[in-house]
Amino acid sequence: KKIDTRTGKTMEKTEKKIELSLKNMKTAT
């Protein structure tokens, strides 16, 4: 996938945060 240096970095961070929150939700349930 293409990554814009400025927005790409923030997108990656948010993606990782979403992944972590999803994992947390799965483990919580």
Swiss-Prot record:
Temperature dependence as stated in the record: Thermostable. Activity remains unaffected even after incubation at 100 degrees Celsius for 30 minutes.
Example of a GO biological process term: defense response to bacterium
Keyword terms: Antibiotic, Antimicrobial, Bacteriocin, Secreted
Location, primary (coarse class): secreted
GO cellular component, one term: extracellular region
Subcellular location: Secreted
Domain of life according to the entry: Bacteria
Activity at various pH: Activity is stable between pH 2 and 9 but decreases at a more basic pH.
Function: Has antibacterial activity against strains of L.monocytogenes, L.lactis, B.subtilis, S.typhi, S.aureus, C.perfringens, E.aerogenes and M.luteus but not against E.coli, S.sonnei, S.pneumoniae, S.faecalis, P.aeruginosa, K.pneumoniae or P.vulgaris.
Stated name of the protein: Bacteriocin
Naturally occurring in which organism (per UniProt): Lactococcus lactis subsp. lactis
